[in-house]
Curated annotation (Swiss-Prot):
The gene is EDA30. The keyword Oxidoreductase does not apply. It comes from Arabidopsis thaliana. This is Protein EMBRYO SAC DEVELOPMENT ARREST 30. Its main location: membrane. CDD domains: O-FucT_plant (cd11299). Its EC number is 2.4.1.-. Glycans are attached at N119, N444, N522, N534, N544.
């Protein structure tokens, strides 16, 4: 009897102990779940605060300017005799621009240059993505949705006469389509405008241009027209100022990124459906995304934009450098360079095809990955958009339920007996399955026309790209996911790289060769997360060399012939000290690939000396990246590997 009572007490004790253990585990799970459910913005600032004073400064050289480019200074002023425009000119040019932010920016620069070439007055272009018919706020017109009109007109007063609208006497004739209309390609030459367009302009006094290729004038102008190239620079880098509201919010975003005094890196993935379809990169994605890319590629083949087969080997295209680097690959490259897991990375781009799923590996490697939605509140973004008229929601309506009478009639009209049992009732259809850019794939063979809400969202993308552009230009480091794609269209990353090269040539901008990078990835693709030391050093050598002379030469050879704004050297820069002749490199046609800049005026030299003194006083000197990495001992490398292993999130397995 006593023995049985002891067993009961032991069983009761075990039961209480089990219940207590279960309660403790549940409470721990709940508290950890609450801790994990934080916003990216709160985590960012908490991370900053915890890192103050504890940040490892061994890798400060990864953020430092490139010393070999510090002699370059922005200088787009006219060099020779440059007469001011006259009101007695050859007439007016009005234009309609189609496309996104990058195409708009490049096209406006070409239009101003053409107006100067033809001695004509330019009417402020109409941006078709931001017309009021697209549902934007009545507070803005098309051009003023993005840019400051008054600044644009005032800055160009010594280059081109710019008017907000056509004179009243000509508006009616334009509505009746009485004026010649041209649809130039982005490779149109000055000869085309002087011989074909100018005579009609003089005759009709007004011509119209429809620009849809991201430009209407060839990038490489004759050597006799350097002033027109400098005019392009003055338009892109001075006259085209974002409207004040965008500038203020962009500056606030940069201040928030640098709140703790730490630098940040901007990364633009370049995952845009149009570019992916053009280059045949569908197989790099899965399921619905691959189908959407192939559908767009079929459309481009039908429209004769592409003269290739529909189905191509995407992996072969990737190995040739024709597809963007995936975010996972970029994360591995940044790790190989030595960037800490705590590095702050700003994700630019209004369109990231593939959604958040393709960003998961990068976010796991760098938790401080933020974008405009995590830096700005909903109210701040709404104020930027302005007051808009409410649009009807695109709600999916369930088909009406059939009555008993209808069901009975269908049963009677069915085939001969014995009849099979009716199918079970359909599962409920949820609204999110029929909404969005992918909803049509399950029901239709053709993509439906954009709804009013889709058109409005496309206009909003211009604002998001403008914010990202301003932040990327100000970043301490810029890493492009897809530039120099060879399509002939301007791209976001190339425009950012060009503006950074003009404003701050020594800022760290990686100009990598994707073909070389993919060759390196093919060596270690089976074990990308644990590369050997030789692979890491080869990656570092290539990426660090792309920051300086070799990267600029490659950019000049590949990017400049298609987009002058992506590489405005040597026309729009000067050097505070002359470059040795032995270091200047020219192409076969005599064009400078590296060097060839004029010597800076004294006022630029003196300003540059003062700035360099300030910079030297603020920051200590660091050895060159490549030399520092070559001198790294085996022991230091092992320590860095151990440190990165401790930085790794314990719950994240790279092989999952």
């Amino acid at each position: 009897m006593v023995f049985k009572s002891r067993i009961k007490w032991i069983a009761l004790f075990v039961l209480i102990l089990s219940m207590g253990s279960l309660v403790v585990h549940l409470s721990m799970t709940k508290s950890s779940g609450v801790q994990l459910a934080y916003s990216a913005r709160d985590n960012l600032w908490q991370d900053f605060d915890s890192l103050l004073g504890a940040q490892d400064f061994r890798n400060k050289h990864l953020w430092r300017p490139v010393k070999s480019l510090e002699t370059l200074q922005p200088y787009a002023n006219p060099r020779n005799s440059y007469p001011a425009p006259s009101s007695k000119n050859n007439g007016f040019i009005y234009a309609k621009i189609f496309g996104g932010f990058d195409k708009i920016r490049s096209s406006i620069c070409d239009l101003v240059t053409i107006s100067r070439l033809l001695n004509a007055t330019l009417v402020i272009p109409e941006l078709q993505e931001s017309l009021r018919s697209k549902g934007i706020s009545n507070k803005f017109k098309s051009f003023s949705y993005l840019y400051d009109e008054e600044q644009f007109i005032a800055f160009l007063k010594n280059d081109v006469i710019v008017m907000k609208t056509l004179p009243e006497s000509l508006k009616a004739a334009r509505k009746r389509n009485e004026f010649p209309l041209f649809k130039p390609k982005n490779s149109a030459s000055p000869k085309f405008y002087l011989e074909d367009v100018l005579p009609k302009l003089k005759k009709a006094n007004v011509i119209g241009l429809i620009v849809s290729d991201g430009g209407c004038l060839q990038s490489a102008l004759p050597a006799s027209m350097p002033e027109l190239q400098r005019l392009r620079c003055r338009v892109a880098f001075h006259a085209l100022q974002l409207r004040p509201e965008i500038q203020v919010l962009a500056k606030e975003m940069v201040d928030r990124l640098r709140k703790s005094g730490q630098p940040f890196l901007a990364y633009h993935p370049g995952l845009v459906r149009e570019k992916l379809a053009y280059h045949g990169c569908a197989e790099l994605f899965q399921d619905i995304h691959s189908e959407l890319i192939q559908y767009r590629r079929a459309q481009m083949i039908k429209q004769r934009f592409i003269l290739e087969e529909l189905i191509v080997d995407s992996r072969l295209r990737r190995d040739n450098g024709l597809c963007p680097l995936m975010p996972e690959e970029v994360g591995i490259l940044l790790k190989a360079l030595g960037y800490s897991q705590k590095a702050i990375i700003y994700l630019a781009g209004s369109e990231i095809f593939g959604g958040q799923r393709v960003l998961i590996p990068l976010r796991a490697m760098f938790p401080n990955l933020v974008d405009r939605t995590s830096l700005c509140s909903t109210e701040e973004l709404s104020e930027l958009v302005g007051p808009e008229t409410p649009l009807p929601e695109n709600t999916y309506k369930m088909p009406p339920r059939k009555s008993d009478k209808q069901l009975k009639e269908e049963w009677n009209k069915a085939g001969p007996r014995p009849r099979p049992l009716p199918p079970p009732p359909d599962r409920p259809i949820y609204q999110h399955e029929k909404e969005g850019w992918y909803g049509w794939l399950t029901e239709n063979d053709t993509e439906p026309s954009p709804s009013p809400m889709d058109l409005r969202n496309q206009a909003h993308r211009l604002l998001w790209d403008a914010l990202d552009f301003a932040v990327s230009v100000e970043a301490d480091v810029f890493f492009p996911g897809f530039n120099n794609d060879g399509s002939g269209w301007p791209d976001f990353s190339s425009l950012v790289m060009g503006q950074r090269l003009y404003e701050r040539p020594s800022s760290r901008t990686y100009r990598l060769d994707r073909k070389v990078i993919q060759e390196l990835f093919n060596i270690t693709r089976e074990d990308m997360y644990h590369p050997n030391r030789n692979w890491t050093l080869r990656v570092r050598k290539h990426l660090n060399s792309s920051l300086g002379e070799s990267g600029l030469i490659r950019q000049s050879m590949l990017s400049k012939p298609r987009s002058f704004l992506s590489h405005p050297l040597p026309e729009c820069s000067c050097r505070t000290s002359a470059l040795e002749d032995s270091r200047q490199i020219q192409s076969d046609d005599g064009r400078f690939l590296y060097g060839g800049e004029d010597e800076c005026p004294k006022w630029i030299k003196s300003a540059g000396v003062e700035k360099s003194k300030t910079d030297d006083g603020d920051q200590p000197d660091y050895d060159h990246d490549l030399l520092a990495e070559q001198s790294e001992t085996e022991e230091e490398f092992a320590k860095s590997k151990v440190a990165s292993a401790f930085d790794q999130d314990e719950e994240w397995d790279p092989n999952d």
